[in-house]
Amino acid sequence: MAEKNERAIKVVAENRKARFNYAIEDTVEAGIALTGTEVKSVRNGKTTIAESYADSKNGEIWLINANIPEYLQANRFNHEPKRPRKLLLHRKQINKLLGAVDREGMTLIPLKLYFNERGRAKLLLAVAKGKKLHDKRESEKKRDWGREKGRLLRARG
């Protein structure tokens, strides 16, 4: 039997500070509308989503401040690196996300930008609430204690 050519999910950019700075309530996978040169640049892996966030305009959700650098081999048809990019979601998903943002003071932050099995660019979007300084310290203490516990158990045998 011939094996099926299966592609793995390729993570291109990850917002590693998001889990430290925000308490994440829910995540949603969203498509992202990119131009041709943006797709090629994202595949090169130079994308940054650390300072970006999602916001609504005219009932749609847009990714703001994500840095996708210009594609070097492109000529005059290149894209603007920090332009707002439309996120592709169903209407029910948009209403749910905007409701959480309006009612509960949540914010929408990207966690990962990746290509799925079909080669489509996807964004893992989180509904999150910002942590205060003492919350960050508390989560850091919990993480350190978990590491220390693991070390003690391994040393004990």
Swiss-Prot record:
Q: Where is this region: Disordered?
A: 134-157
Taxonomic path: Bacteria, Pseudomonadati, Pseudomonadota, Alphaproteobacteria, Hyphomicrobiales
UniProt-listed InterPro entries:
SmpB, SsrA-bd_prot, SsrA-bd_prot_CS
According to its UniProt record, which protein family does this protein belong to? Belongs to the SmpB family.
Keywords (A to Z) from UniProt = Cytoplasm, RNA-binding
What's the chief localization of this chain? cytoplasm
The residue ranges flagged as biased composition, category Basic and acidic residues, are 135-151
Query: Could you tell me where this protein is found in the cell?
Result: Cytoplasm
GO biological process terms held by the UniProt record? trans-translation
Q: What is this protein called?
A: SsrA-binding protein
Naturally occurring in which organism (per UniProt): Nitrobacter hamburgensis (strain DSM 10229 / NCIMB 13809 / X14)
| One GO MF term attached to the UniProt entry | RNA binding
User: GO cellular component annotations, sorted alphabetically?
Assistant: cytosol
Q: Which cysteines are joined by disulfide bonds?
A: none
Gene name tied to this protein: smpB
What function does the entry list? Required for rescue of stalled ribosomes mediated by trans-translation. Binds to transfer-messenger RNA (tmRNA), required for stable association of tmRNA with ribosomes. tmRNA and SmpB together mimic tRNA shape, replacing the anticodon stem-loop with SmpB. tmRNA is encoded by the ssrA gene; the 2 termini fold to resemble tRNA(Ala) and it encodes a 'tag peptide', a short internal open reading frame. During trans-translation Ala-aminoacylated tmRNA acts like a tRNA, entering the A-site of stalled ribosomes, displacing the stalled mRNA.
